[in-house]
Amino acid sequence: MEAAVAAAAAAAGAVTTAVAPPPGAAVSNGVATAPPPFLMKTYEMVDDPATDAVVSWGPGNNSFVVWNTPEFARDLLPKYFKHSNFSSFVRQLNTYGFRKVDPDRWEFANEGFLRGQKHLLKTINRRKPTHGNNQVQQPQLPAAPVPACVEVGKFGMEEEIEMLKRDKNVLMQELVRLRQQQQTTDHQLQTLGKRLQGMEQRQQQMMSFLAKAMHSPGFLAQFVQQNENSRRRIVASNKKRRLPKQDGSLDSESASLDGQIVKYQPMINEAAKAMLRKILKLDSSHRFESMGNSDNFLLENYMPNGQGLDSSSSTRNSGVTLAEVPANSGLPYVATSSGLSAICSTSTPQIQCPVVLDNGIPKEVPNMSAVPSVPKAVAPGPTDINILEFPDLQDIVAEENVDIPGGGFEMPGPEGVFSLPEEGDDSVPIETDEILYNDDTQKLPAIIDSFWEQFLVASPLSVDNDEVDSGVLDQKETQQGNGWTKAENMANLTEQMGLLSSHHTG
């Protein structure tokens, strides 16, 4: 009986010895052990869907990727591994044979760490150095084909350091840019403050100036006067500039229209009265005695008012009336019915005055001494001969007086103008005949006219003058009806000169 109990105890001890695995062995006599706690915790952390934003399985489900390293070290490592050192976690992965798949991101892989195959974790062993017979060699399983991986170790740390350096450089550049922008903004603020201060100062100065000006009594009057002066200058600058007036000229001015001179002509009564007063003061006896000196002048006689300017006025010449005046009368102008006159006087008895016709060729007037003289009996009382000057009629030409040299003056044109030089004068003022007349305007009567008969007695000269005037009227009528040419004008002038000579000789 005792022998049987001893045998049973020996058998039980043998079984116990056979079941207990040796220390450090994963499998003993076909019985598997549990995987390491590090691998179990890592698998649970990666497989948890709540942590996919921080860490999750890779595209091939044979690796896991840490997407947010700072948050992984701050939140997950303390929860599962009781520390927050990401580098320590990477080193522990390296001891279990994990490798870094992608150098640009934190992706790790192991042939026994697969999604949905948690039982393969027991095949992952921790790498330790062998110590002789105490360790049992684990059976080697066939390795699954895994792409080339990079060992996590010193190389991974250096790469992380380089990445941190690049991030630091980027942050430093951004900091420098922000500092420059801050300096620029500060400078702009300072400039704006200075401008604002200057504006405030100017505003204060303006207010103080206005306050002083309002208290000043003469400020408003001076301001108004300056405005009036400015307005006057503007109005004066807008007015047309007037030509300077000649000495003794009339107040009315003439306007030049298309080369013509518009002249002011006084009424017949005023002009006649002025001339009559001058003539009555002359020494008639002394004046008619000097008629024998052959000092003659030419008077250009226009048509009467009834035969005013017409369409043929530009192609015909006016008639010529010859008369005698005193030698020393000194008349600057001799008024006729047309308002056009010229003077020709010399000291010699033979007077030859050049005549300028339309063709510009000067002609000579025959000897004017052949004109019969007036008897002395018809002369009024003696007075100074030089009194016969007409200051009231000298300024008929409002625009200007033309100074003609003593040698003669020629004016080409359809109307003939006589050049009548004098010995004692360097220049003779000539009036142009381009005058705008009105048919209603009364013209000054001619020398031989019925207007003067009521003041002067008849003389033998009136007969000759009447004949000459009748010839002139016939000449004008023929000229108006037939339109004389320039050659006919010259012929008619020569015929009149001959008629005067025949009367004198007869």
Curated annotation (Swiss-Prot):
Residues 232-243 have a biased composition (Basic residues). Its main location: nucleus. Exhibits temperature-dependent phosphorylation. It comes from the Eukaryota. A motif (Nuclear localization signal) lies at residues 239-242. GO terms for molecular function: DNA-binding transcription factor activity; sequence-specific DNA binding. PROSITE patterns: HSF_DOMAIN. Pfam families: HSF_DNA-bind (PF00447). The keyword Coiled coil applies. Residues 231-254 are annotated as: Disordered. Induction: Not induced by heat stress. A motif (AHA) lies at residues 449-456. Keywords: Coiled coil, DNA-binding, Nucleus, Phosphoprotein, Stress response, Transcription, Transcription regulation. SMART domains: HSF (SM00415). GO terms for biological process: cellular response to heat; regulation of transcription by RNA polymerase II. Transcriptional regulator that specifically binds DNA of heat shock promoter elements (HSE). Belongs to the HSF family. Class A subfamily. The hydrophobic-rich region (HR-A/B) corresponds to the oligomerization domain. AHA motifs are transcriptional activator elements. Homotrimer. This is Heat stress transcription factor A-1. The gene is HSFA1.
